[in-house]
């Protein structure tokens, strides 16, 4: 029995945990920022990083793509654990081949789902079966919410070991001023994804963190431009008011429908800055907001203004 225990301890010592993280996107990319956040936590726990570059992999042959991945997983040992953050925002073929490579090494795979592209964009919905197949090949899947899990089960997901993230953490390493109550709403996001910003005519000003060059000049908006995390936290806490988590569906982007299933990084950003929340009444975190007294959920933007 002694040699069995020693052999098992030796296997545990040799086993390593790896975590993927994407590179090559804009520093403003929430996809890049959120993967880096998870990766940094993993590094603190002793995980080894596998960097994955974001690029046009359609220009590569299968062999070239395979060679690239061999370099990414060069430090992988048989039986190691890999936390695979998805999507990589490369092609579905890329993610599938990467999973093939991991399984060929006998890796145990924890797939950490940040977003599901086929559920975000109507034109990509046809890829959902392939994405679910990748989840089914994983040993463990971390999903944003139970609502998303329920939906995926209806579409064929069978993985038995599933964890729910529910809410993003947002570590802050600086001292922030205590926000004061102000009759303002703050919002951050791309105007192409959230066009309601351009139609803002309410009597309460909207403080907008994003590209203000395309804003309607008649809108009641104070555009402050894009800010990095530290600047954003300081600005939000200094100006006070409420953080607005709002989305609406349109032809190609089903933002509102998707918000019922995903975990909003924006919500956690506002909370980390000390701002209460005003959000769509059907946002996935509505119960979390209500149970902890973190703000209000409303059905219309007019109601959001009234709550302020």
Regions of interest found by a model, annotated:
Residues 296-302:
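Conserved acidic donor-binding segment of nucleotide-sugar-dependent glycosyltransferases
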Residues 228-273, 279-287:
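Nucleotide-sugar-dependent
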Residues 168-238:
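Conserved catalytic-core segment of nucleotide-activated headgroup transferases in glycan assembly
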Residues 139-153, 157-174:
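Donor nucleotide-sugar binding/catalytic pocket of nucleotide-sugar-dependent glycosyltransferases
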Residues 59-150:
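Extended catalytic core of nucleotide-activated donor transferases of GT-like folds
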